[in-house]
Regions:
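Class I SAM-dependent methyltransferase SAM/SAH-binding core
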Residues: 94-143
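Short catalytic micro-motifs in class I SAM-dependent methyltransferases
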Residues: 158-159
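A conserved beta-strand element that flanks and buttresses the S-adenosyl-L-methionine
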Residues: 155
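Conserved class I S-adenosyl-L-methionine
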Residues: 6-82, 84-93, 100, 120, 182-213
């Protein structure tokens, strides 16, 4: 029998159900700076090896991240950037996206707030013989160490959900993009299917949601040691982009699971993987009702050719 959780434990355990190593050391791919942001960086620093392993794990959480990287690279290739283009990986984490872009002939500037992640990216670049194509450094996403109009493309995977001020980050990313440059990033979906089906998180069940709101911030999941992740709607993302002088070009939702009940994983891993694969195929095919309820959004935005950014 499952052990009943105290309210404070409930707030923590959802992130553990979604990410098997979150309770131990939740990692975050972010480059940041308020008090909450600093706690995120500290945890991220301690979880560098876990974020390296996630791209080879054979479970739902691993498959979602592997699919995220695959879709990201496919979208980048479709942009048709010239060989040798200088691109930004903001919140590079373990460096997997940086490596993939370098392998495709791009010159990558990789930044992250966590020194251990930067070291891991540098190690991977050296091991792959890509030192000349990847420059990795510790830097904050709120104040990037680049002049304006530096890049035709900026990539930021797994960063926005962990930021206290996503607007400031997106505005700063826009600043370093060239006019008509692209920003490719992810955000967590507030209306993900896994949450809609769990009565403890479903917005359709107002009384239970009111109870959950006593232990969670609205639109946030508070994880271990007070770390919060933030979920957004596409309308909110569009507002962030518009304020930063950008517009959304395309988006998809992806990632189905792990499914939970009362913040506990509800399906055996092998069944969860099959459910994810089936639902992801439907979402990729644009199936109504499924295409918009994945766990994350992958979003491609383009900077306006006008240099003005709304204040």
């Amino acid at each position: 029998m499952s052990q009943a959780l105290e309210p404070a434990q409930m707030a923590m355990s959802y992130s553990s159900a979604v990410d098997p190593f979150a309770q131990k050391r939740p990692g975050v791919e972010a480059v940041i700076g308020s008090s909450d942001d600093e706690r995120v960086v500290a945890h991220f620093d301690s979880a560098a090896l876990d974020w390296k392993k996630i791209y080879s794990r054979r479970d739902v959480w691993g498959i979602i991240h592997q699919d995220r990287l695959s879709k990201t690279m496919a979208w980048i290739e479709a942009l048709g950037l010239p060989q040798g283009a200088r691109v930004l990986d903001a919140g590079c984490g373990a460096g997997l996206a940086s490596l993939a872009m370098a392998h495709r002939g791009y010159e990558v500037e990789a930044v992250d707030a966590a020194a251990s992640m930067v070291a891991l990216t540098q190690q991977h670049a050296s091991q792959g013989g890509l030192d000349a194509r990847i420059s990795a450094r510790v830097a904050g996403i709120y104040k990037l160490p680049f002049v304006q109009h530096s890049f035709p493309l900026a990539v930021s995977l797994g960063v926005i959900p962990w930021l206290e001020d996503p607007q400031q980050a997106i505005t700063e990313l826009s600043r370093v993009l060239q006019p008509a440059g692209y920003l490719l990033f992810t955000a967590d979906n507030r209306r993900r299917l896994a949450w809609l089906l769990d009565p403890f998180t479903s917005p359709a069940l107002r009384p239970i949601k009111n109870f959950v709101n006593m232990v969670m911030r609205r639109s946030q999941t508070r994880g271990w040691d007070g770390i919060c992740s933030h979920q957004h709607s596409i309308a909110e993302i569009d507002a962030f982009l518009s304020h930063a002088g950008m517009k959304r070009v395309r988006f998809i939702s992806f990632g189905f699971g792990p499914f939970t009940f009362a913040y506990r994983k509800a399906l055996p891993e092998w069944i969860g993987m099959q459910v994810h694969n089936i639902l992801q195929r439907l979402a990729d095919a644009g199936f109504p009702g499924i295409r918009s309820v994945g766990a994350q959004y992958l979003i491609l935005a383009q900077k306006n050719t006008s240099l003005s950014i709304s204040k």
